[in-house]
A protein has these predicted regions:
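Segments forming glycine/polar-rich beta-alpha architectures that bind adenosine-containing cofactors
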Residues: 348-354, 359-360, 365
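Short, surface-exposed helix-loop/turn micro-motifs enriched in polar/charged residues
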Residues: 338, 354, 374-375
């Protein structure tokens, strides 16, 4: 009998590993995807990773009608396939230690850790490189649905001072791996560097099928111990650069907070930008990390209070049932009646992110029992 290939450790509440799986990196990314029903992403590193990977960030209800590729014999075949498309790379940073960029696929790293905490809805990873311990933690807020938080910690491991430089990027130069004609589905409408950070406004490209074009605005603001150095805009990206010296026996924190708004909730580009700015000023900029984090933990605790299934004496089964519930609730929790249950959640592009009748038929009873009645 074939043995199960297990790349993640068994733990009742976590999907975790102490190995960076170069050969199975895509699988690791799928297993550590997170979301909040409004948006989500695969478990990609924020830092540069030049190895094989599938970068993916998705917004629920934001899609594009990709023209089908089909031979002449397929009479009656649909003209397009609706896809929940890869939106922006909002997690991206270029991390330099002592003027050399960190590439996790190339650099010799040690003490690697990776953990999706399903109880709290957070993903964390860490590693040692060039005399520095790097610790990353992220979550897609279950309290402020438009907010994703990325925190990076740096701890000196030797008696040397290290210069840490971080270029934080929002990048629209993204693709869908399953695009039928290798098209990029996004065009940039607007971009700006501001006192608190930067924003990038994009729109899905025009299509010949009369389907609406979606506008998406992503902004980044920052907190922590780093000094702002410079800002830049490029054709398809915005960048904010921060840096400081990490002294021996000390530690530093850098926070990247991303707010994403779309034309699903606002009338036009100006309104999407204004709505984004309002969320940043009213709900994000003055909040300490611990406040944002605690709101996340509290929101997920309420979900688990209703939904948790306890299995004694079988940790693998316990992990499995919680993983399924976590991914379901990360995908859809009923807050937006316009949305539905994507069969693969925010783990990637399989099935185009569309919902199928069998997903509905089998999942609705679960949601009726474990979420608010308005879920349907």
């Amino acid at each position: 009998m074939n043995q199960i290939k297990r790349i993640m450790a068994i733990d009742p509440w976590k999907i975790k590993s102490d190995t960076l799986e170069i050969e199975d990196r895509r699988l690791q990314e799928s297993l550590t995807a997170i979301g909040n029903g409004y948006m989500g992403m695969r478990g990609n590193f924020s830092e540069t990773y030049s190895g094989d990977s599938h970068q993916g960030f998705y917004l629920a209800g934001v899609w594009y009608p990709d023209k089908t590729r089909v031979g002449w014999w397929k009479n009656g075949y649909p003209e397009y396939f609706g896809k929940a498309i890869n939106a922006l790379n909002i997690a991206k940073i270029n991390l330099n230690i002592d003027e050399v960029e960190v590439d996790l696929a190339v650099d010799p790293i040690s003490n690697f850790t990776l953990a999706l905490d399903m109880q709290k809805g957070t993903l964390s990873y860490g590693y040692d490189v060039r005399g520095v311990r790097v610790s990353a933690e992220r979550f897609f807020s279950a309290d402020v649905r438009e907010l994703a938080v990325f925190k990076f910690g740096f701890e000196a491991l030797d008696d040397q001072a290290h210069y840490i430089r971080i270029a934080s990027v929002i990048d629209a130069d993204v693709k869908n791996e399953d695009a039928n004609y290798d098209e990029q589905f996004w065009q940039v409408l607007d971009q700006a560097n501001q006192s608190q950070g930067s924003y990038l406004a994009t729109q899905t490209i025009a299509n010949p099928f009369g389907i609406e074009q979606f506008t998406v605005v992503a902004s980044q603001s920052f907190a922590g111990d780093f000094e702002g150095l410079e800002q830049a805009t490029a054709e398809r990206s915005v960048t904010d650069v921060y840096g400081t010296v990490l002294k021996p026996e000390t530690s530093l924190i850098f926070e990247k907070r991303v707010v994403v708004t779309t034309s699903r909730d606002y009338a036009d580009l100006a309104a999407v930008i204004a709505g984004n700015a309002a969320i940043v000023s009213e709900k994000v900029i003055d909040q300490a990390y611990q406040q944002l984090y605690q709101a996340q933990v509290t929101a997920w605790a309420k979900r688990w209070e209703l939904a948790d299934v306890v299995i004694e004496g079988a940790d693998a089964a316990q992990q499995g049932i919680r993983f399924n519930l976590f991914q379901l609730f990360s995908t859809y929790y009923g807050e937006d009646e316009r949305l539905n249950i994507g069969p693969k959640g925010f783990t990637g592009e399989k099935y185009g992110g569309a919902t199928y009748w069998d997903t509905e038929a089998y999942a609705v009873p679960l949601y009726l029992s474990l979420a608010d009645q308005q879920v349907t």
